[in-house]
């Protein structure tokens, strides 16, 4: 079972919140105290919440659910992409485009355009164009890849969002809320837990903390996908 320990979280600095003057009073239940003007998150609260979230991610993945990892902060970008690819899921790590979920029809058209351009770049179409036209299409493809590359094979709306920094990704959280998609999010002391179904109180800036969150989430998803494969094997065996 994918789980994290208290030691894992302490070593990663999950307990370091933001400066006290930036706090959101809604996070008071999850704050242990303050040290040198910085709020300290109560990891006794975070630990069970994090492990409950991981168990639910495993359950969603075991039902063939799609998980979208979201983290567009510079500190989160690479880790989010790597974790999503590791568990064969999806990611947005550059910029959240408004309507990415709530206007999926339009997004789907942009994804189709991206795939068309990828095909053109590989089948020699670009070579037949003028240098200027080829460059323009190449730039368009790169721009679309940056925004949509992590969701181009998602094939529809996700079944869950795993978000690094609820405050920073508030548009993604709101869109998921509007569509009834469960939100799992790291919520720091300066953020609001409103709209987050699975609140994980923790530092949302430290690279080591972010690495812990996304690798644990990826492990939970992989475990769920493993269960899914095991069930499929058992059903196939029963059918024989």
From Swiss-Prot:
Q: Coiled coil where?
A: none
One Gene Ontology BP term is:
translation
Q: Which InterPro entries match?
A: Ribosomal_uS2, Ribosomal_uS2_bac/mit/plastid, Ribosomal_uS2_CS, Ribosomal_uS2_flav_dom_sf
Q: A Gene Ontology CC term for this entry? A: cytosolic small ribosomal subunit
Please provide the record's keywords in A-Z order.
Answer: Ribonucleoprotein, Ribosomal protein
- Species this protein is from: Haemophilus influenzae (strain ATCC 51907 / DSM 11121 / KW20 / Rd)
The highest taxon in the source lineage is Bacteria
Q: Does the record's keyword annotation contain Ribonucleoprotein?
A: yes
| The name this protein goes by in its record | Small ribosomal subunit protein uS2
**Family that this chain belongs to:** Belongs to the universal ribosomal protein uS2 family.
Task: Cite a single Pfam family from the UniProt record.
Answer: Ribosomal_S2
Q: Could you tell me one molecular function GO term of this UniProt entry?
A: structural constituent of ribosome
Q: In the UniProt record, does the keyword Ribosomal protein occur?
A: yes
């Amino acid at each position: 079972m994918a789980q994290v320990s208290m030691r894992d979280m302490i070593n990663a600095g999950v307990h370091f919140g933001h400066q006290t003057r930036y706090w959101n009073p809604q996070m008071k239940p999850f704050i242990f105290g303050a040290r040198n003007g910085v709020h300290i998150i109560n990891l006794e609260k975070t630990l069970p919440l994090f492990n409950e979230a991981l168990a639910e991610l495993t359950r969603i993945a075991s039902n063939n659910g799609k998980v979208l990892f979201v983290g567009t902060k510079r500190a989160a970008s690479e880790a989010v992409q790597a974790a999503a690819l590791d568990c064969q899921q999806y990611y947005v790590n550059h910029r959240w485009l408004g309507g990415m979920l709530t206007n999926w029809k339009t997004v789907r058209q942009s994804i189709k355009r991206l795939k068309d351009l990828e095909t053109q770049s590989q089948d020699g179409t670009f070579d037949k164009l003028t240098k200027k036209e080829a460059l323009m299409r190449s730039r368009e493809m790169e721009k679309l890849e940056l925004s949509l590359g992590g969701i181009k094979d998602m094939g529809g709306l996700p079944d869950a969002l795993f978000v690094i920094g609820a405050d920073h990704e508030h548009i993604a959280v709101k869109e998921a809320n509007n569509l009834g998609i469960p939100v799992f999010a790291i919520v720091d002391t300066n953020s609001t837990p409103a709209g987050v179904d699975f609140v994980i109180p923790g530092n949302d800036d430290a690279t080591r903390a972010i690495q812990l969150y996304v690798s644990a989430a990826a492990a939970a998803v992989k475990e769920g996908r493993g269960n899914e494969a095991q069930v499929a094997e058992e059903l196939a065996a029963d059918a024989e």
